[in-house]
Design a protein with these regions (language model features):
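Phosphate/dinucleotide-binding and metal-coordinating scaffold of catalytic cores
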Residues: 1-169
Length: 169
């Protein structure tokens, strides 16, 4: 059961996995597992007022991070089957759930990204895009796993980093 914290809620139902997450007694997909090999699950996102933001969508969820994936509270990469606008952010397939396990204030990423956005607003010729994010509560396979920071994945794309990919020239 989740208590209303006034934050949006992300509900993930992800079957299978190739790694034990002993803290919650679930299997999860490792970072090394390609999304093509992850069993599809479902994700539903609720606004802070309880209304549906993203109706049950097909999604694949796996661990992310080189170091953070080994912390007790796991960060996740999420890939939707089709682009979707999430919590007021532009539509895309790929999203990130940052666990902020080492940051006891849970504010470091939010503040740093906010400062970067402010710089880009003040410097029109400067940074064309910055990560947007939102604090959420996450329920994973029926287990409330806490407060996370749902944000855009850094990726070359018109809705993300609008640059020419040097490898595609």
């Amino acid at each position: 059961e989740i208590v209303n914290t006034g934050l949006p809620v992300v509900v993930i139902n992800q079957p299978g996995g190739d790694k034990d997450w002993s803290n919650i007694g679930e299997k999860i997909w490792s970072k090394e597992t390609d999304f093509d090999n992850v069993t599809a699950g479902q994700i539903t996102i609720y606004n802070a007022d309880g209304t549906v933001n993203l109706a049950t969508a097909t999604a694949m969820t796996r661990l992310r991070g080189n170091t953070t994936k080994d912390y007790p509270k796991k960060p996740f990469a999420v890939k939707l089957d089709k682009k979707a606008k999430v919590l007021g952010m532009p539509g895309h397939k790929r999203w990130v759930l940052l666990a902020n396990w080492k940051d006891k204030s849970l504010m470091r990423n939010h503040i740093a990204l906010g400062i970067a956005r402010k710089f880009s607003e003040e410097m029109p010729d400067g940074i064309p895009w910055n990560v947007r994010g939102q604090f959420v509560e996450v329920v994973y396979n029926g287990v409330h796993i806490g407060n996370y920071y749902l944000c855009e994945q850094i990726k070359i794309d018109d809705n993300r980093v609008p640059i020419q990919d040097e490898y595609e020239k």
